[in-house]
Amino acid sequence: MKNGIEAMITDITATTAEAEDYTGEDGLLYCGKCHTPKEAYFAEGKTCFGRDRHPAECDCQRAAREKQQAAESRQKHLEKVEDLKRRGFTDPAMRNWTFEHDNGRNPQTETARFYVESWETMQAENIGYLFWGGVGTGKSYLAACIAHALMEKEVAVCMTNFATILNDLAASFDGRNEYISRLCSYPLLILDDFGMERGTEYGLEQVYSVIDSRYRSGKPLIATTNLTLEELQHPQDTPHARIYDRLTSMCAPVRFTGSNFRKETAQEKLERLKQLMKQRKESL
C-alpha cells in the first residue's frame, strides 16, 4: 500500500516536460515558450517522498487556464440569462425590447436606465415605478428594457399583466396561493397595462390580492398604465381605492407624454409599402 501511495504522490509532484522546455540555472524546469518556471521548490528543508519540488503553472499555462475558466463562466452566464428571459416574459415579443434597440426618442429613457443603475438601492428601499400616460408612448417598452437589463445582471424579473394572471388563477384555483407566492418571490415584478383587466368583483379581488401580497413582501413593483394620475388618486369606488392606494404607495409616478409611437410606426410602414408599390410599378 505504501508503495502505491508513494507512486501516486510521485506522479502528482512530477512535472511533464515538453520538447522545448529546459532546466534553468536554479535547477527548475522552465517553459520553452514563456520562459517562466513550471516547477517550484518546497519550503526550505521540506520534501515529499524524497522530492524537493512540485509542479507550478508557467505564465502560458496560467493564461490558458484563466481563458478556459472565463469561457466557462461566460457560457454559464449566457445560459442563466437565457433561462431568466424565457421564464420572465409572458409575451415573447418583449424579448426584443431592449435599451440597445431603443431609438433614443423617449425622454424617460434615462429614468429607466437610472432604475437599473440604482437597482441595489431601489431593491433595498422598495422603490418602484408607475409609468403612466397615453397609449403608445413607450411605457411597456421601457419597462421591458429595465427587465432585460436586470436579467443581464442575473436578477430574476417577471413581466406580465393581469389578463394573464387572472387566466392562470382561473385555470389553477387550487394553487392560487402558491401562484401568488411565486409572483412575489421575484426580486422585481412588472405589471404591464395595469387597469385594463376586467372589472368584475372576482377580478378586482384577485388584483387586490396580488398587489397587496406584493406590498407585504417588501419587494419593488413596476406598473404601466393608461390611467391618469387623477384617476389613480381619485378612484371611482372602494374596491379600486384599495388597489390604487397600495399601488401608489409602492411606486413613484413617472409621466409619459409625446406622440404615439405605434401610430408613427404604422405610418412609416404605410409609406414604405407605397414606396415598394411605386418601385414595382416603375419596373414593369
Q: Language-model features: where?
A:
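Short glycine-rich substrate-engagement loop in P-loop NTPases that contacts/grips substrate
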Residues: 107-116, 124, 147-188, 198-205
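Pre-Walker A (pre-P-loop) alpha-helix and adjacent loop at the N terminus of AAA/AAA+ ATPase modules
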Residues: 95-129
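Walker A/P-loop nucleotide-binding motif
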Residues: 123-143
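Generic beta-sheet signal
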Residues: 127-131, 187-189, 221
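Active-site donor-binding loop signature of nucleotide-sugar glycosyltransferases
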Residues: 60, 104, 162, 256-258
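Walker B catalytic acidic pair
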Residues: 193-194
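A short, basic N-terminal segment
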Residues: 1-103, 264-284
